[in-house]
């Protein structure tokens, strides 16, 4: 769960167990396929997922045509396949799964600090405000898992998703 500021008011979060990086996904063969900066998307029609940072971050692109958000990532992917948008906002860590199912897509990622800023650190465990002991235990367990193990676990989860 993303540790957004509004969510922090209602629940407690562990330290992030996986960093969240946002990117844009486009169709191969379009003018955006070789984009290297957010500025390259000036005038592009970009789509996000309703009520998530996959939508809120679109306005960080100057001159963008911010399309009305859709309900889910599969809806976003369908719209990109249909060509009714130029790009969609995605979590970069999920890109391998999207590309496996959609070989005509291209992921555009950006150097650190030059891409979309979701406004939170990453994926965390969310707990009730009253669960302080459990929060401490969860953070202690997460601290025993090094980055290599976390990446392996994430990759295993991605590889076991239905395509």
Roles of regions detected by a PLM:
Residues 1-40, 106-118:
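Acidic, polar ligand-binding/catalytic clefts
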Residues 51-61:
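Aromatic-rich, solvent-exposed beta-strand/loop patch
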Residues 28-32, 42-45, 49-53, 115-162:
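Extended ligand-binding regions for polar small-molecule ligands
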Residues 48-49, 65-73, 79:
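Short beta-strand-to-loop elements that line the ligand-binding cleft
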Residues 24, 41, 80-81, 138:
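Hydrophobic residues within well-ordered alpha-helices
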Residues 24, 46, 67, 107-108, ...:
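Generic preference for hydrophobic
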Residues 1-5, 28, 51-52, 72-73, ...:
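Beta->alpha turn/N-cap motifs
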Residues 8-12, 40, 60-61, 74-96, ...:
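Short helices/loops that flank or line small-molecule/ion binding pockets
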